[in-house]
From Swiss-Prot:
The lineage of its organism: Eukaryota, Metazoa, Chordata, Craniata, Vertebrata. Signal peptide: none annotated. It is found in: Nucleus; Cytoplasm. The gene is mbnl3. This is Muscleblind-like protein 3. Expressed in fast and slow myotomal muscle, heart, liver, skin, brain and testis. SMART domains: ZnF_C3H1. Belongs to the muscleblind family.
Length: 323
């Protein structure tokens, strides 16, 4: 079932902070070097922020005095990365909303949930082990966790994920953020873009290039502004590629942090059992379990439906003679 959604354009990913030194007229950096925006007089600045021109990112803005910012190459690269991340978030939100709409719209099909048999050792009597009136309910279902044996519970995950983990093939592959692909047109001498405009690396020395991957290793000291080597064997990227590397490192750190918080798929997570129903003052806590209540009520109804045994006979001097 498809859910149609009309989502307006979100301008948050197009918003840039304006350079305060530029507003005071004291910024010593140029537009292509400063990491903050240097808007023109025609741009609309609100609360120290300015919105970038979406048409300018596509290279199709024809307005003479555009009220939106036309960003330099290094800020344009940062905005393109923000736009891709924003699109991924919108698709994830749309998928989550479509999944939630299945529970509210009529005729929605619910996904089946795989369950496992409950504890059968609790059924000590044949009447509890089997009953034609309660044939769809396991004997251990509805009992409080505190009443079950004090053994840990195993929560099963995905069998495919467990098999993949056992084979050792589920380890994530970490992408390196200190490498840049070399421009093939630059290697042929046909690149029409400058070093500050091309999205690929333009190394000055051929010895920097890794021929197997056609990439160069970036000098991280140069990005941090502390490279003091005369002839550095690593690549010193321009400003727009530096912004791209910093954004990739930030995204990689976020992915690592989220992966560390979430358990791997398919693992058997051990859930500790709670102690017996005791409070700090020694009183027993009163707990109401709906499934247990319905189960006991069904047992009571099953007993009431059976015909009562009433002996029949004749009274003879206060003695009952059974027929």
């Amino acid at each position: 079932m498809a859910v149609n959604m009309t989502m307006g354009r979100d301008t948050k990913w197009l918003t840039l902070e304006v350079c305060r030194e530029f507003q005071r007229g004291t910024c010593s950096r140029s537009d292509a070097e400063c990491k903050f925006a240097h808007p023109s007089r025609s741009c609309h600045v609100e609360n120290g922020r300015v919105i970038a021109c979406f048409d300018s990112l596509k290279g199709r803005c024809t307005r003479e005095n555009c009220k939106y910012l036309h960003p330099p190459p290094h800020l344009k690269t940062q905005l393109e990365i923000n736009g891709r991340n924003n699109l991924i978030q919108q698709k994830a939100a749309a998928a989550m909303l479509a999944q939630q709409m299945q529970f509210m719209l009529p005729g929605a099909q619910l996904q089946p949930i795989t369950t496992f048999p409950m504890t059968h050792s609790l059924a000590t009597s044949p009447s509890m082990a089997f009953s034609p009136y309660l044939n769809h309910m396991g004997p251990g279902m509805g009992l409080m966790p505190e009443l079950l044996p004090s053994t840990p519970l195993l929560v099963p995950g995905s069998p495919t994920g467990l098999a993949a983990m056992s084979n050792g093939t589920s380890s994530p592959k970490h992408m390196r953020t200190d490498k840049l692909e070399v421009c093939r047109e630059f290697q042929r001498g046909n690149c029409t873009r400058g070093e500050s405009d091309c999205r690929y690396a333009h190394p000055l020395e051929a010895g920097m290039v890794d021929s197997s991957e056609n990439s160069v290793i970036v000098c991280m000291d140069y990005i941090k502004g502390r490279c003091s080597r005369d002839k550095c064997k690593y690549f010193h990227p321009p400003a727009h590629l530096q912004a791209r590397i910093k954004a990739s490192q930030h995204q990689a750190s976020q992915n690592t942090a989220s992966a560390a918080l979430s358990p791997p798929a398919g693992t058997m997570q051990l859930l500790p059992k709670r102690p017996v129903l005791e409070k700090s003052n020694g009183a027993v806590a009163g707990i109401f379990n709906p499934s247990m209540f319905h189960y006991q009520q069904a047992l009571a109804n099953m007993q009431l439906q059976q015909p009562a045994f009433i002996p029949t006979g004749e009274w003879c001097s206060g003695v009952v003679t059974l027929c």
